[in-house]
């Protein structure tokens, strides 16, 4: 059994370098919600050095709110913006001797694409247009996964160690109670349950089926790094290989 561990990089966190020693995939911010050409280059170099799979992390053009505010953009605009961001990171990755493997949308773009078919289709279409070999990462069971499969892309279904789930398998919005799991034991138990048994307990108590192919780790701060180390160790202890 294997599991991919992914983390978002190039978003201004001081812990990026250490996080790259723990994860198997890196999602690199492409300049819209965070990052710039130089942070993208630095992140790619570190990922190549650590043998970590490189992916683009496109977001809404919303630096002020870190890409976490809902935006109602036409699908053709989202398509063009996604192409633009993937293309920029692909060029930098190529120049640094790496290979871009996947695309994972950021923040509210990710959340809206999980539920809005037109937005999901625009993103999947852009990924396919850039390179049909790219893997599309999205919330397990979401519209984005459906759209990726529709375009013939390989998809990777993502679960979250530190986020609460609703009964329909969607994440509890950050604005609501129960959105973030701050207890390390609870996060660890939830993640192992999702990976080993394919289910998650919602905040209302129901067990919801979920397919876990990659686990998102948030790496900001020493506490997050300590949890990342502990989670990786827990997988290895159970014979679960960590690899992209």
From Swiss-Prot:
The keyword Iron does not apply. NCBIfam families: PRK05406.1-1, PRK05406.1-3, PRK05406.1-4, PRK05406.1-5. Keywords: ATP-binding, Hydrolase, Nucleotide-binding. Catalyzes the cleavage of 5-oxoproline to form L-glutamate coupled to the hydrolysis of ATP to ADP and inorganic phosphate. The keyword Protease does not apply. PANTHER family: 5-OXOPROLINASE SUBUNIT A (PTHR30292:SF0), UNCHARACTERIZED PROTEIN YBGL-RELATED (PTHR30292). One of its GO terms (molecular function) is ATP binding. It holds the Pfam family LamB_YcsF. It catalyses: 5-oxo-L-proline + ATP + 2 H2O = L-glutamate + ADP + phosphate + H(+). Forms a complex composed of PxpA, PxpB and PxpC. Its EC number is 3.5.2.9. This is 5-oxoprolinase subunit A. Belongs to the LamB/PxpA family. GO terms for biological process: carbohydrate metabolic process. It is an enzyme of class 3 (hydrolase).
